[in-house]
Amino acid sequence: MTPLRSGIVAAVAALIADQASKLWLLFVFDIGHRGAVRVTPFFDLVLAWNTGISYGWFQTDSPVGATILLAIKAGAVVLLAIWMARSQTRLATIGLGLIIGGAIGNAIDRFAYGAVVDFVLFHVPLAGKTYSWYVFNLADVAIVAGVIALLYDSFLRTPAAKAP
């Protein structure tokens, strides 16, 4: 399998996993009516509608703001796809594919629902307080894994020979 094909497979896999998990939680498990569900002492399934970007930054309920965020995301996906098509290493193309698949998954949510569906909440009770991370989804996991793959690939690559 060529590196580009590996990246495309990663993008499609990330997109399918993300959308399947969200559709199942929303329409089969019906998390909207059930409310938060404790899965383990440190992990809950919750429903959070994120109208902003990462970590809830730039929250917007206006159609103009949502359109701007979608346009920025579409532009980023196009640039990432060009980078992926030109990439020479399998790890980089897989990383870029994961980022693209995650970005498209979240963009589908924003287009379909007006917000991104987040549902994973990790928390740790410590010294009488509960510390928690932001609520996220599988698209976010794919994006982070893709960035880690790109960073790892950049450290693995052998430096080009210096010109004489």
Swiss-Prot record:
The active site is at residues 118, 140. GO terms for cellular component: plasma membrane. Pathway: Protein modification; lipoprotein biosynthesis (signal peptide cleavage). It is a multi-pass membrane protein. PROSITE patterns: SPASE_II (PS00855). The keyword Protease applies. It is found in: Cell inner membrane. It catalyses: Release of signal peptides from bacterial membrane prolipoproteins. Hydrolyzes -Xaa-Yaa-Zaa-|-(S,diacylglyceryl)Cys-, in which Xaa is hydrophobic (preferably Leu), and Yaa (Ala or Ser) and Zaa (Gly or Ala) have small, neutral side chains. Its main location: membrane. Its EC number is 3.4.23.36. GO terms for molecular function: aspartic-type endopeptidase activity. One of its GO terms (biological process) is proteolysis. Keywords: Aspartyl protease, Cell inner membrane, Cell membrane, Hydrolase, Membrane, Protease, Transmembrane, Transmembrane helix. It is an enzyme of class 3 (hydrolase). The chain crosses the membrane at residues 8-28, 39-59, 64-84, 91-111, 131-151. This protein specifically catalyzes the removal of signal peptides from prolipoproteins. PANTHER family: LIPOPROTEIN SIGNAL PEPTIDASE (PTHR33695:SF1). Belongs to the peptidase A8 family. This is Lipoprotein signal peptidase. The lineage of its organism: Bacteria, Pseudomonadati, Pseudomonadota, Alphaproteobacteria, Hyphomicrobiales.
